[in-house]
């Protein structure tokens, strides 16, 4: 089993260098949102983008952890005892939905899965089926097109939000004029695009 590189620390160092060289305020603010236990720069970037608040250019999807161990009940062994397997998704997001139910979304990124062979496809199906046995749990597999095209990336974030049972964010406030809401939503879009451009798009793995 591969061990996590200290890419949380590496991401902090990269962001710190940006700060010293006059890098963007978004990169500086991101320092406090970097998560440890990442296997790759892409995982670190996705965690930042999905987890940071809207005002900082993130999607504010919920509490983000990197490569957590998740126990899943498998078939019983020959003695009739319950058997468990452990899976480690790249990213786990946990959030309370509008109905008060806490849901979890697991995300796995595979830079090569866009050109996946039969073995990779079967592996992804097995992984989804394993997670499907868990209550209030959804699994997403992301490939390069979903993360390197911002429109697809934004749609993925919307699907994750819905899987978590959360309301649309941003949503129109009570008494807010439609024009004001559209302006606020557009401003958030530009912030999300800018952060994605800095922490997700440059990564290939």
What are the functions of these language-model segments?
Residues 2-205:
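Surface segments flanking catalytic/ligand-binding clefts of nucleic-acid enzymes
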């Amino acid at each position: 089993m591969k061990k996590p590189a200290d890419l949380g620390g590496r991401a902090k160092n990269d962001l710190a260098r940006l700060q010293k060289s006059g890098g963007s305020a978004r990169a500086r603010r991101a320092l406090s949102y970097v998560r440890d236990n990442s296997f790759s720069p892409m995982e670190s970037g996705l965690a930042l983008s999905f987890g940071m608040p809207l005002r900082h250019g993130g999607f504010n999807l919920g509490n983000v952890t990197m490569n957590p161990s998740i126990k899943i009940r498998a078939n019983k062994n020959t003695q009739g005892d319950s058997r468990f397997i452990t899976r480690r998704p790249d990213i786990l997001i946990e959030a309370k939905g509008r109905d008060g139910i806490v849901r979890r979304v697991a995300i796995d990124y595979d830079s090569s899965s866009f050109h996946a062979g039969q073995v990779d496809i079967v592996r992804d199906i097995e992984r989804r089926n394993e997670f499907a046995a868990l209550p209030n749990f959804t699994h997403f597999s992301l490939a390069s097109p979903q993360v390197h095209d911002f429109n697809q990336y934004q749609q993925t974030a919307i699907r994750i939000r819905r899987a978590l049972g959360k309301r649309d964010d941003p949503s129109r406030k009570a008494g807010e004029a439609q024009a004001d809401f559209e302006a606020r939503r557009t401003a958030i879009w530009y912030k999300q695009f800018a952060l994605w451009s800095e922490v997700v798009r440059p990564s290939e793995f």
